[in-house]
Amino acid sequence: MVKITINGQCIETQENNTILQAAASAGIRIPTLCYLKDINEIGACRVCAVEVEGYAKLVTACNNRVQEGMVIHTNSPKAMEARRTNVKLILSQHDSNCAVCIRSGNCSLQRLANDLGILEVPFEKEIPENNWDRKFPLQRNAAKCIKCMRCIQVCDKIQDLHIWDVAGTGSRTTVDVSGNRVISEADCSLCGQCVTHCPVGALHERDDIGQVVHALADENKITVVQIAPSVRAAWGEGLGISQEKATVKRLVAGLRRMGFDYIFDTDFSADLTIMEEGSEFVQRLSEEKESKLPMFTSCCPGWVRFLKSQYPDMVDQLSSAKSPQQMFGAIAKSYYAELLGVDPASIFCVSIMPCLAKKQECAYPVSYTHLTLPTILRV
């Protein structure tokens, strides 16, 4: 243990702690932007810069360890001025049109600028152009990127796919798809971790709400929606609604008021997936040497993309059963269309799910014409 002083408060902390960790343990908040515990501790944003007595320069709190007798000032005039300047420099290369940003109200940079009282940016704006495939489920806006490197570190250290990398030099340094590739040709599994850890609106999922609204307004369309179990269980959290009020009945009632004709739970098609995969597994076991084992589930499109790109020699071990989302779509466009006596093309299926990869999965070309039900349920 070492003894240090932060903002006049004497603190005893672990010897290997960073200044940021020591301050947090004492209830002292030091603002950060790029910091991600154990993943991204590079001090790139310089927002966590603090003043240490005896040091000629400010030091970043996220990656500098405490030392015995340190006297630290987190909000000294020198530290605050540097913090404001660093944020202003970041804003000079950031599209600050917050009113139409997907992260408005939930943006780390926006909150930090407000906390620091930044009302104007004295530096000349240098906003990079945004060239991105608008059809791809994962969307990136280069004009919003603050070069925090979180996406790179998360993809490298957690997913180990190395999709992102640093591109350019000097003031033109940015983040882009590694290997000078376009995102659709990269090995991205669409896990969504880079989106989750992006502190601003630079990374986000493709917005398909417009298509849904258009379908709901079309009198010739029969709208069918399926709700994933995880969404059913947690939909109220994002809206600040208690578990007692965020019931399934209220969720269904809300979808009804929006105009959906038929509402289903993905539990149904998940059961179909289990039955199909179980039957296939028994069949593979009976074939002995003719089948490759173990058999892997195919219910997760992110996992399927990962296996195909990283372990192509194991593709034959994937189950041929569709995922629950695909099975529901197949049933809706075949059996259910026949039950309703309507043209399958008039049915518009909507999936409310927490998975980015499912946006790509639902775009796969599939034909259900003249197929038997067992065939429809298989890939």
Identify the residue ranges that each predicted region occupies.
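Glycine-rich beta-alpha junction loops
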Residues: 66, 105, 158, 229-231, ...
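Eukaryote-biased recognition of intrinsically disordered, low-complexity regulatory segments
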Residues: 1-7
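Fe-S ferredoxin-like electron-transfer domains
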Residues: 46-190, 196, 203-218, 222
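Cofactor-cradling patches in redox/metallo enzymes
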Residues: 51, 80-81, 234-244, 251, ...
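N-terminal cofactor/phosphate-binding cores enriched in small/glycine residues
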Residues: 11-68
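Conserved small/polar residues in nucleotide/adenosyl-binding loops
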Residues: 369-375
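Flanking helices and flexible, charged tails adjoining ferredoxin-like Fe-S electron-transfer domains
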Residues: 176-289, 318-322
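Extended hydrophobic secondary-structure segments that form protein cores and membrane-embedded regions
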Residues: 226, 295-297, 348-354
